[in-house]
A protein has these predicted regions:
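Mechanochemical coupling/switch segment within NTP-driven translocation systems
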Residues: 1-96, 149
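Non-catalytic alpha-helical scaffolds
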Residues: 1-32, 36, 82-84, 96-127, ...
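Catalytic micro-motifs at enzyme active sites that drive phosphoryl/nucleotidyl and oxygen chemistry
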Residues: 89-90, 117-118, 150-152, 188
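Short, flexible loop/turn elements at secondary-structure junctions
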Residues: 90-92, 105-108, 167-169, 205
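Conserved Switch II/interswitch segment of TRAFAC-class P-loop GTPases
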Residues: 107-110, 124-144, 165-176
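Amphipathic helical hotspot of TIR/SEFIR-family domains
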Residues: 138-155, 178-182
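Catalytic core segments in nucleotide and nucleic-acid processing enzymes
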Residues: 161, 168, 179, 183-185, ...
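Short, flexible/disordered intra-domain loops and linkers
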Residues: 173-178, 212-216
């Protein structure tokens, strides 16, 4: 909370936040003196000041409340602004399936600057529902959020994004509704989201229909169609991925059972000869694992990282021009009685803050692309090793395992924020007329361009080094994990062979087990 307060003080250029006197500073603020871009921060500070006495003593604590008090924490801004997060336990058919619903801060929220938190939900959630409204035009923050969705969409195994246009009942005709949906579709495609799944709904009409048990009205509301598609996604598409993974595991178990049955069918002499061959081959098998562990993927990773970050710098450079036009705009820098120097300072701060967020989102998306790249490299090397070993005898039943988990490296926030001092550039702004109708705005942009490029390069180079080092280490860990897996398969197989005692009962049991495994695998394949 203190960090959020300090950040809003910085955005509004009202000095540094001090706990002993910040309330006095906020009480002196006048709405008419606040630039348009800072109004959400002004509202936040007003709400925080109103609730400080009641809530500041609870900072850092966890509270358990009933539903009535929960409503107050959500609806009353002077309490809600103090809450970092809420876990609501609510029983309904959806949650009883084990589904957890997460409501993230809106794109225009002051908390939207925490790009890393939002990115983790994009990356790790099973489904994403983006809700917009019938009469809502996409803001700059909306467009930035959607652009991030567009960057990461192609990295997922399934299309898990659903776009809902709420309040569809406001449409005066089906033609008008179609035009609105077409506009949303165009905006999403512009953001890089190909083939978006868009569902116009009236949540109000749907709720009324649900309560009345009116299936016809529920269908007209559009909600029934969305619910049907979403249920199919949860029950079939996601379940299909899990079923396919389970089927692969069953298949590997089946191969091991078959291998054991084959060993049981051999005579004692044949098994002894096989064990002797194992002892002879164990050394070469271990040597091949040493080679796998020693595979150097760093040149490819470093090259890929460099290329990706280079393109990030190019896109950020282009974004800086668009954002500059937006923040140094006549609507924000008017002579309307306000403090023009403060307005100029806020415009410069917000431009750099917006650009910083753009850079952070680009770098986070780059981390996801690198995950997929390194994952593919590890799988490639494991596949090559497997192909080499599969032609040699004797060998256990070998298969490539999935590399476990990817943590996102720390990118940081505010990478560019506060890098420029507005006083160094105030001379370019003589007055609004000269700035916008004359050469002032273009001259300022040119003056900022070179130092900005240097800043972006410095940050990008530093993050590039971080990403390269991180994913090179992850590649080493991945190959080590894969080699350990192959080594364990050998150990388990050899222990099985040495422990076999020929038994008709065991053979019959294994044959029956193999049959059940094959049947279960087939059933799971059908689901997937």
């Amino acid at each position: 909370m203190r960090e959020d307060l300090a950040y809003s003080f910085g955005v509004l250029q009202i000095g540094s936040w001090q706990e002993h006197n910040w309330l006095d500073t906020v009480r002196k603020l006048k709405a008419k003196d606040i630039p348009a871009s800072g109004r959400s921060h002004y509202s936040f500070l007003q709400a925080a000041a109103l609730g400080w006495e009641e809530n500041s003593g609870h900072l850092g604590e966890s509270l358990t409340v009933d539903m009535a008090e929960f409503s107050a924490f959500v609806a009353e801004e002077n309490r809600a602004c103090y809450v970092a997060g809420i876990d609501l336990y609510y029983s309904c058919p959806l949650t009883e399936q084990g589904i957890v619903l997460v409501d993230t801060p809106g794109a225009d929220s002051i908390h939207a600057r925490h790009t890393g938190v939002t990115f983790q939900y994009m990356k790790n959630s099973d489904a994403l529902l983006y809700v917009t409204y019938y009469n809502h035009a996409f803001s700059r923050a909306d467009k930035q959020f959607l652009a991030q969705l567009g960057r990461v969409k192609g990295s997922f195994a399934l299309d898990k994004m659903f776009f809902i246009v709420n309040a569809a009942d406001l449409a005066s005709s089906s033609e008008e509704l179609h035009e609105v949906v077409a506009h949303v579709d165009s905006s999403l495609r512009t953001a890089g989201i190909e083939r978006p799944q868009i569902y116009p709904v009236s949540s109000l009409n749907a709720l009324e229909a649900k309560l009345a048990g009116d299936e016809s009205s529920l269908s007209v509301s559009g909600f029934a169609e969305f619910a049907s598609v979403f249920d199919s996604f949860i029950g079939h598409d996601l379940s299909g991925l899990a079923a396919a993974s389970a089927a692969d595991e069953l298949h590997q178990s089946l191969l091991r059972v078959q291998q054991r049955i084959s060993a049981l069918s051999q005579s004692g002499t044949e098994r002894e000869q096989l064990i002797q061959r194992l002892e002879q081959e164990r050394g070469s098998y271990q040597e091949s694992l040493v080679c796998l562990r020693g595979t150097d993927l760093s040149p490819e990773i470093i090259q890929e990282t460099g290329e990706l970050v280079f393109h990030v710098r190019q896109r950020v450079r282009l974004a800086s021009i668009d954002l500059y036009r937006e923040f140094f705009h006549p609507s924000l820098l008017q002579e309307d009685g306000g403090d023009m120097k403060k307005k100029f300072a806020v415009s410069l701060h917000d431009w750099m803050s917006g650009l910083s967020g753009e850079l952070e989102r680009e770098l986070l998306a780059t981390s996801l692309r690198l995950e997929k790249k390194v994952d593919a490299l590890i799988s490639r090397e494991a596949g090559k090793w497997l192909e080499h070993e599969s032609g040699r005898e004797p060998r256990p039943s070998l298969f490539v395992k999935e590399f476990s988990g990817w943590a996102t490296p720390e990118i940081g926030e505010g990478l560019l924020t506060g890098r420029f001092n507005w006083k160094d550039y105030w001379s370019y702004f003589k007055n609004p007329k000269h700035f916008f109708e004359g050469s002032g705005r273009e001259a300022l942009r040119e003056a900022l361009a070179a130092p900005l490029d240097d800043m972006v390069k410095e940050v990008a180079d530093r993050i590039q080094e971080t990403l390269s080092s991180y994913y090179c280490n992850e590649a080493v860990r991945g190959l080590e994990e894969m080699a350990d897996h192959f080594e364990q398969l050998w150990v388990e197989w050899e222990e099985e062979l040495r422990g076999i005692q020929a038994s008709g009962d065991e053979t019959d049991t294994l044959i029956a087990l193999g049959k059940r495994l094959a049947e279960s695998e087939q059933q799971l394949r059908q689901i997937s």
